[in-house]
């Protein structure tokens, strides 16, 4: 689901995963949601962001956690 929406590039945001075509990191989206921001607030603050991209960031984080758990 997220593979076309989340990209990494060592020359963009120090290689952190970002929403494709932006400099919005997955980390930033997760931090905002964890701090209590709503999806609508994120969309208002970042006009290039979409609901699909926010869902992709969550799916990416979940996949990463599952990968880490499987490796331990």
Locations of the language-model features?
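Hydrophobic, amphipathic alpha-helical faces that serve as interaction scaffolds
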Residues: 64-65
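Short Lys/Arg-enriched helix C-cap and helix-to-coil transition segments
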Residues: 68-72
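Basic, low-complexity segments
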Residues: 1-13
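Amphipathic, hydrophobic secondary-structure cores in small proteins
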Residues: 17-60
